[in-house]
A protein has these predicted regions:
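Active-site SXXK
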Residues: 41, 59-84, 111, 159-163
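Glycine/charged-rich beta-loop-alpha catalytic/anionic-binding loops adjacent to active sites
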Residues: 47-56, 137-145, 194-197
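Catalytic nucleophile serine of serine hydrolases
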Residues: 62-63, 150-153
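Amphipathic alpha-helical interface segments
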Residues: 128-146, 155
Length: 204
């Protein structure tokens, strides 16, 4: 609690403190690509580790999940979806002949919270023949949605597919148009696609 109430001047980080912080990370063998520290809206420290550098694009992996959630939030704000909508209603083309009740019950909100009806990621990232979105609906459910948290990349991937289906454009292009461009987000950025052309909204 001692940190509360301190003035901005008292909280200024020194170069020595930042260097010491980096040394601790390196000593603990944290796999680093780069270290950037900002204070009061300004970048005050940066260090890169080969082969990474300031001007080299880096894959952000699961950070992409946050962008997918943002896009879903914007669609809800626009009135195009409700978080209580059932995800099956948007992908009838991928549904099995008999839809399991737990799958039919699953909502967009369940997926955002990673409380789907699966206890595993449903797609095989090494497969070039099984559609990653389709596999989400073809996999046998393991439990009722909303009852169990399970960190899952496939739910974010399907939500990204939903964004692209409803907007008719790549998810990152949609986000750039709606808000990212206004805050100076990199125009060079892109999201890797799965073998079937859907942006990898959970790991790209």
């Amino acid at each position: 609690m001692g940190g509360y109430g301190m003035t901005d001047k008292m909280r200024e980080l020194t170069d020595g403190q930042m260097q010491e912080f980096v040394k601790v990370l390196e000593k603990r063998r944290v796999p680093l690509h780069s270290v950037l520290i900002a204070q009061h809206g300004k970048l005050i420290f940066e260090k890169y580790y080969a082969p990474y550098c300031r001007n080299k694009l880096q894959r952000m992996f699961s950070v992409t999940k946050g962008f997918t959630s943002l896009a879903i939030g914007l669609l809800e704000q626009e009135g195009k979806i409700s978080l209580q909508d059932h995800i099956c209603d948007y992908f009838p083309e991928y549904l099995p002949g008999r839809v399991h009740p737990w799958l039919a019950e699953m909502t967009i909100e369940n997926m955002l919270k990673m409380q789907t009806c699966y206890n595993m990621t449903t797609y095989n990232k090494t497969s070039t023949t099984e559609n990653w979105v389709r596999s989400f609906f073809q996999t046998e459910p393991t439990h009722r949605p909303g009852t169990l948290f399970m960190y899952d990349t496939s739910s974010s991937h399907v939500l990204c597919a939903l964004v692209e289906k409803l907007t008719g454009e790549k998810m990152l292009d949609y986000l750039k148009e709606k808000m990212l461009r206004q805050i100076g987000f990199s125009e060079e950025s892109y999201i890797i696609e799965d073998p079937f052309g859907t942006s990898m909204g959970g790991s790209g």
